[in-house]
Regions:
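Metal-dependent phosphoesterase core characteristic of DEDDh/y 3'-5' exonuclease domains
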Residues: 2-12, 17-28, 48-151, 155-159
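Short, flexible loop segments at the rims of nucleotide/cofactor-binding pockets, characterized by
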Residues: 28-34
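Short, basic/hydrophobic alpha-helical segments
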Residues: 35-49
Length: 160
């Protein structure tokens, strides 16, 4: 793992509607940080702020990978399991207050076909991918192009 990117937004509520004001978009740490340091920074940030996590397939891929890698390095994520209650927590699939996985929401929690972030972007006339796909990340890392990977992650995040 060479990059963990995040977007911080302020939620403005207007009745039943929410609007999001972008505050910050970046990759955590620095390009030279090792995996353990990246994970400590990411999970420490979330433990302090307890923000709503918004992802695209984050519940099925990103968050499990982050948790497994945290286990390898002895980075505690216990707070993830204690926040909220049984029905409204970061582990509750159907509550979007702590974690809104857009893939789950758009597919009616896999009751209908799953679509890619690229397909959703095309339908909404959003730019989507900018010249790099996920299949190229390992090659970029091997070539030492960590900044390119960080920018790719940030672009994916902005699209989400």
């Amino acid at each position: 793992m060479v990059a963990i990117s995040f977007l911080e937004a302020e939620i403005e509520r207007h009745g039943n509607q929410e609007a999001y004001l972008l505050r910050e978009l970046r990759s955590g740490g620095e390009a030279g940080f090792d995996e353990k340091k990246l994970l400590q920074g990411f999970f420490g940030y979330f433990e302090r702020l307890k923000p709503r996590l918004v992802s695209f397939n984050g519940r099925g891929f990103d968050l499990p990978v982050l948790k497994y890698r945290a286990m390898v390095h002895g980075v505690s994520v216990s707070w993830l399991y204690g926040a909220g209650d049984n029905w409204n927590s970061s582990q509750s699939r159907y509550s979007t207050d702590w974690h809104c996985d857009l893939l789950d929401v758009l597919s009616d929690y896999v009751a209908s076909a799953r679509v890619s972030l690229h397909e959703v972007s095309a339908v909404l006339d959003l730019p989507g991918k900018f010249g790099i796909s996920g299949s190229q990340v390992a090659e970029l890392v091997d070539e030492g192009r960590i900044e390119d990977v960080r920018h790719y992650c940030e672009t994916d995040l902005l699209t989400t």
